[in-house]
Regions:
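Bacterial N-terminal signal peptides that target proteins for export
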Residues: 1-8
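Bacterial N-terminal signal peptides
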Residues: 8-17
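Sec/Tat signal peptide C-region and signal peptidase I cleavage site
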Residues: 18-23
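Fold-level signature of zinc-dependent metallopeptidase catalytic domains
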Residues: 25-55
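Structural recognition of the beta-strand scaffold that forms the well-ordered cores
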Residues: 31-34, 114-118, 138-141, 165, ...
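Metzincin-family zinc-dependent endopeptidase catalytic domain
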Residues: 43-159
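Metalloprotease/metallohydrolase-associated module, dominated by Zn2+-dependent proteases
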Residues: 134-153, 169-212
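Active-site recognition of the HExxH zinc-binding catalytic motif
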Residues: 156-170
Length: 212
């Protein structure tokens, strides 16, 4: 098994995840990916992370398929960057609730389960539940050194964020994908380059996404 240094940002999820409900009625989990550039190294990493979750779904026999749509140079990119910055700057000081402003219509208009922005800002990656409606907004930081020099770290961060949108919260197991917040550590990946899920997380996914 390959070993590497795995580092998670300080805030990966700014609130507790809520387990999905009635997902057996709709196995599709739609993710819209917005990138400014087709050459962004995070784009293939994001597709690999989605493939990881679909492979995990197949291995566990889940009624779940993550379906991606890639959009390059969207006309709403600036609005999404502004929203990402406003969330990141809070650093967890404000959790979604009655006082949380609605997400911009530029996000909700996509009508997807997840809008994932490959941000061009120096922010902390996060997965943010949309206030008063289903769905999540993910922003992935632009850290060119980490992304190019440590691709395993980058793809695990992206897979981690997508995991939150599937209902998985943080855990305190430093050898697992959903650990957070984690300090720098030496973790062991599988043969696909991803950290594993815990047994309890695998069982939770089987419960939430049980086949009919």
């Amino acid at each position: 098994m390959k070993r590497y240094q795995y580092v998670l940002p300080a805030i990966l999820l700014l609130c507790n995840s809520v387990p999905p409900v009635l997902l057996a009625q709709d196995a599709a989990h739609y993710v819209v990916i917005l990138s400014h550039d087709t050459n962004d190294v995070r784009l293939p990493m994001t597709l690999e992370a989605i493939r990881f979750w679909n492979n995990t779904s197949a291995e566990l026999g889940l009624n779940l398929k993550v379906i991606e749509q890639v959009i390059i140079r969207s006309s709403v990119e600036r609005q999404l960057e502004n929203y990402a910055r406003s969330i990141s700057q809070r650093a967890g000081r404000l959790r979604p609730g009655p006082s949380e402003p609605d997400a911009p219509v530029e996000i909700t208009d996509f009508e997807s389960d997840v809008v994932l922005l490959l941000s061009r800002q120096d922010l902390m990656s996060f997965a943010w539940p949309l206030p008063r409606r289903p769905g999540h907004f993910i922003a992935i930081e632009e850290d060119r050194y980490t992304m190019t020099q440590n691709p395993n770290i980058a793809r695990n961060i992206i897979a981690h964020e997508i995991g939150h949108t599937l209902g998985l919260p943080h855990n305190n197991d430093p050898t697992s994908l959903m650990c957070g917040p984690c300090q720098p550590l030496t973790a062991e990946s599988d043969n696909r380059g991803f950290l594993p899920l815990t047994d309890s997380e695998r069982n939770a996914l089987r419960e939430w996404y049980a086949l009919l």
